[in-house]
């Protein structure tokens, strides 16, 4: 039988395989001296595909060559034989009808099955009947079907249960590689992840809600890749501590109270509301229209998971407040002399309201001269200065409203001739004046002594603080413009005559008194 011209079953030989075979056979050129080798194209064959056992360096002077299945030349394992001299093909006992033998020694297998995998022997007989053999091996792999993920626990509980996921491939698992991914990221062994030998089974220890997935297992062999459908775990958890929104806890009468409660839970939690510890509604939201101050109190959201048996609560205190009324500002005197004191009082009927002070429509910046009462209702300025002149207001507020008082303008009376010097500057001036007077007095004494003849004259330099009876140079203490006497320096110049006999009566000494006055206003 001439195998090279044998007809193939319809649809069994892909055109791509035949074209590849033709290309390989056309490019083959025999060599006379090289060793015969055989190449399986491809070496890893997908089931139901073709494989070509391509011979290299086939000798030219051959009487015949034959292919055998296995590493043998037993007659019952012969597939086909070719005789070059007669260009004839013959089939053997192992021929399946899917093989084609070529004159260059190559053998084409069509529609490969798993049973075809193994070793094949080419037996060559030369013209002198000497026989040589060459062998080749190829592997056949199944086309992988889509795998499927199964779980040993369909409803694991967070923190309590572990789960094993198994990738079922429906083919021989020994020749398959398994890869796992979660949320598109590759998984490997870790603290809570364990993989079986071969990676076919993935175990999650002490599952959490973050282990939900989805999971995908991927199967690989040398000829194909396939992936499972995404698989997600139904992890039971919760409820977490509920959150009540919105965050507002103060409302004014006439508004609507609308509260919503949420707690993470699987399955979804059951919700209950209690007002002042009394059951009110079994819903996730609570709505009370047109509230009054009687609606103030504690609002409790109670949640329960019927599967885990866990419950959680959150309490929110709601206060309904009346808007504040306008405060009234009063003052001891709106026209104040500089360095006097003034007291402003903010009057309000709203107990517990917050009080703030404003100066020229801006928040008042307190100085060391300003003091506030414990509840901020009284502002005292002592002493008051000209920069304190302006408009004052008080502002009261509660969490739902704010009101400002009437405006009071403070006028400050001050002496325009006053420079407004500090106490330190005044003290410096006084010291300077006293020192200047003393210097002038000393200079006058020196000049007078020289003019009177040097050391013959005596000078009496004294300092007194004359009484008001003798030297009442300052205004009366009762004067509105009181002036304080600081010091008086009294210079007494006693002119001495030359010494005279003791019998002669001494004439009175001429005395001159000079006053220098330094005053502090």
Swiss-Prot record:
Biased composition (Basic and acidic residues): 457-466
Gene3D superfamilies xref list: Immunoglobulins
Region described as Interaction with calmodulin: 445-457
Gene disruption phenotype: Knockout mice exhibit impairment of insulin clearance and hyperinsulinemia, which cause insulin resistance; develop insulin resistance primarily in liver. Display normal white blood cell, red blood cell, hemoglobin and platelet. On the other hand, mice have a high number of neutrophils. Display also increased thrombus growth, and enhanced susceptibility to type I collagen induced pulmonary thromboembolism. Spontaneously develop systemic neutrophilia.
Main location (coarse class): membrane
Occurrences of domain Ig-like V-type (ranges): 35-142
Modification sites for Phosphoserine: 503
Entry-linked InterPro entries: CEA_cell_adhesion, Ig-like_dom, Ig-like_dom_sf, Ig-like_fold, Ig_sub, Ig_sub2, Ig_V-set
Annotated keywords: Cell junction, Cell membrane, Cell projection, Cytoplasmic vesicle, Disulfide bond, Glycoprotein, Host cell receptor for virus entry, Host-virus interaction, Immunoglobulin domain, Membrane, Phosphoprotein, Receptor, Repeat, Signal, Transmembrane, Transmembrane helix
Tissue specificity: Expressed in granulocytes, lymphocytes, granulocytes, B cells, and T-cells. Expressed in bone. Highly expressed in liver and femur. Highly expressed in neutrophils, and to a lesser extent inmonocytes, and macrophages. Slightly higher expressed in peripheral blood neutrophils (PBNs). Intestinal T-cells predominantly express isoform 2 while extraintestinal T-cells mainly express isoform 1. Expressed in small intestine and colon.
Biological-process GO terms, alphabetical: bile acid and bile salt transport; blood vessel development; calcium-independent cell-cell adhesion via plasma membrane cell-adhesion molecules; CD4-positive, alpha-beta T cell activation; CD8-positive, alpha-beta T cell activation; cell-cell junction organization; cellular response to insulin stimulus; common myeloid progenitor cell proliferation
SUPFAM superfamilies hit by this protein: Immunoglobulin (SSF48726)
Residues of the Ig-like C2-type domain: 147-234, 239-319, 323-411
Region (Disordered): 455-521
Chain residue ranges for the region called Interaction with FLNA: 447-521
PROSITE patterns tied to this protein: IG_LIKE
Region described as Required for interaction with PTPN11 and PTPN6 and for control of phosphorylation level: spans on this chain: 484-521
Bias (Polar residues): 467-481, 491-514
Region (Essential for interaction with PTPN11 and PTPN6): 515-518
Membrane topology: Single-pass type I membrane protein
Induction: In intestinal epithelium, up-regulated in the presence of Gram-positive commensal gut bacteria. May also be up-regulated by interferon gamma (IFNG) and TNF (TNF-alpha). Isoform 2: Expression is promoted and maintained by the mucosal environment. Induced by IL2 on natural killer cell.
Subunit structure: (Microbial infection) Interacts with MHV S1 spike glycoprotein.
Entry's family note: Belongs to the immunoglobulin superfamily. CEA family.
Protein name listed in UniProt: Cell adhesion molecule CEACAM1
């Amino acid at each position: 039988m001439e195998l090279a011209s044998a007809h193939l079953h319809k649809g069994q030989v892909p055109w791509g395989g035949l074209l590849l075979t033709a290309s390989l056979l056309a490019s083959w050129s025999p060599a006379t001296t090289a060793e015969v080798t055989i190449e399986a194209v491809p070496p890893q064959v997908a089931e139901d595909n073709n494989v070509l056992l391509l011979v290299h360096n086939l000798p030219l002077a051959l009487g015949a060559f034959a292919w055998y299945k296995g590493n043998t030349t037993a007659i019952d394992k012969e597939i086909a034989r070719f005789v070059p001299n007669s260009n004839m093909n013959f089939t053997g006992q192992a021929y399946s009808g899917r093989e084609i033998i070529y004159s260059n020694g190559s053998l084409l297998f069509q529609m490969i099955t798993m049973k075809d995998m193994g070793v094949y022997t080419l037996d060559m007989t030369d013209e002198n009947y000497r026989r040589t053999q060459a062998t080749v091996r190829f592997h056949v792999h199944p086309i992988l079907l889509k795998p499927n993920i199964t779980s040993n626990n369909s409803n694991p509980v967070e923190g309590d249960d572990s789960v094993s996921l198994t990738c079922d491939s429906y083919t021989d698992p020994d020749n398959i590689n398994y890869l796992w991914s979660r949320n598109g990221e590759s998984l490997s062994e870790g603290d809570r992840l364990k993989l079986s030998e071969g990676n076919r089974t993935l175990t999650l220890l002490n599952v959490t809600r973050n282990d939900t997935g989805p999971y995908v297992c991927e199967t690989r062999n040398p000829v194909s890749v396939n992936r499972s459908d995404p698989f997600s775990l139904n992890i039971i958890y919760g409820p977490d501590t509920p959150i009540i929104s919105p965050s507002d806890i103060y409302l004014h009468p006439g508004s609507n109270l609308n509260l919503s409660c949420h707690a993470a839970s699987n399955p979804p939690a059951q919700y209950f509301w209690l007002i002042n510890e009394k059951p009110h509604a079994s819903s996730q939201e609570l709505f009370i229209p047109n509230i009054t101050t009687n609606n103030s109190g504690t609002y409790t959201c109670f949640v329960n998971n019927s599967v885990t048996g866990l419950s959680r609560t959150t309490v929110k205190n709601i206060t309904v407040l009346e808007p504040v009324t306008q405060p009234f500002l009063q003052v001891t005197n709106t026209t104040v002399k500089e360095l006097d004191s003034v007291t402003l009082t903010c009057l309000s009927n709203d107990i517990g309201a917050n009080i703030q002070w404003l100066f020229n429509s801006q928040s008042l910046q307190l100085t060391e001269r300003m003091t506030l009462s414990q509840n901020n209702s009284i502002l005292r300025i002592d002493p008051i200065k000209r920069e304190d002149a302006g408009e004052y207001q008080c502002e009261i507020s509660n969490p739902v409203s704010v009101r400002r008082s009437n405006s009071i303008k403070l006028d400050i009376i001050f002496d325009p001739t006053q420079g407004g010097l500090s106490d330190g500057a005044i003290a410096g001036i006084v010291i300077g004046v006293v020192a200047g007077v003393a210097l002038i007095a000393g200079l006058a004494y020196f000049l007078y002594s020289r003019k009177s003849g040097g050391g013959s004259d005596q000078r009496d330099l004294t300092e007194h603080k004359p009484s008001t009876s003798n030297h009442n140079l300052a205004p009366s203490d009762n004067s509105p413009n009181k002036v304080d006497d600081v010091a008086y320096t009294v210079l007494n110049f006693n002119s001495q005559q030359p010494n005279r006999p003791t019998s002669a009566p001494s004439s009175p000494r001429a005395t001159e008194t000079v006053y220098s006055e330094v005053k502090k206003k």
